[in-house]
């Protein structure tokens, strides 16, 4: 029984590592395909822009191109700094656009695969992802049979699809650069 429990724990850790690697790979592709921020209706209009307002500016650009931005991917550190801001006296600011884990109605997802200072704002319907179940295989190579060793390979096969016409529905933004654009000159 102990060996079976140990095997199941090792298998679960192995599967989690493969799935995390797979998720990070998908995020990397989405970031690489993301359209850069250009300009929005909020540019040059804000006194104290923050991460949340930068994300909303990107949302306005995406929505202006007939997409519906409904998802934000951010580094956990950026999410915390977005949620907890203070005024000049040190009082916590209540942000009307930040409620129930959402920014202006967009669901926020946290991932360390996103660099600090970067956010992805997107219409989640523009990507389609198909994948296999987690596959675990065992085998031997070279002299492993002689040494009584085996190798384990964990895999997930995945296809991430997006039509070229839908690429503007995903925007990868540098939060500081967008905040600088939003600032009143």
Residue ranges of model-derived segments:
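Alpha-helical scaffold segments that mediate packing/assembly in large oligomeric complexes
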Residues: 1-64, 178-185
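Composition- and surface-driven signal marking solvent-exposed, interaction-prone regions
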Residues: 6-7, 85-88, 164-171
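Extended oligomerization regions of viral-like shell subunits
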Residues: 38-156, 161
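Protruding loop/beta-arch "assembly-hinge" segments enriched in small, turn-prone residues
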Residues: 143-185
